[in-house]
Structure formats: C-alpha cells, structure tokens
C-alpha cells in the first residue's frame, strides 16, 4: 500500500482539502472516487486530482 493524496476543491468555501488514502500501487481513478464516496461528503462530481506520496503538485489556470 502507498499513500495517495486526493485533493478536492470545496466549492462552498473555495478551499482545497487534501486527504491521504492508503491504496495499492496500481490504483485507478475509480479507486479514488470510491474512497471519496465512502470517506467524505464529496463525490466524483467534484473537481479533484491525485498524486503519489513523493510529489504533490498544484496546477493553476
């Protein structure tokens, strides 16, 4: 298992929340969606990105 950081933009307060999830090294996007649905009040309809534990990047547009 590895630490995967899942960042979610909370549109209610315009802040980015970062969660740490334990996942297998071959995790897929669907795994993060399932984790969000089970462990937070966010769903896959929210905007989020994932990074492995060695790097967290933020892209501004």
PLM region descriptions:
Residues 33-61:
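Short, mixed-charge low-complexity intrinsically disordered segments
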Residues 2-26, 30:
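N-terminal acidic leader/helix
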């Amino acid at each position: 298992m590895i630490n995967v950081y899942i960042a979610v933009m909370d549109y209610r307060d315009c802040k980015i929340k970062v969660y740490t999830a334990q996942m297998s090294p071959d995790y897929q996007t669907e795994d993060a969606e399932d984790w969000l649905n089970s462990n937070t009040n966010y769903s896959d309809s929210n905007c989020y990105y994932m990074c492995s534990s060695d790097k967290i990047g933020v892209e501004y547009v």
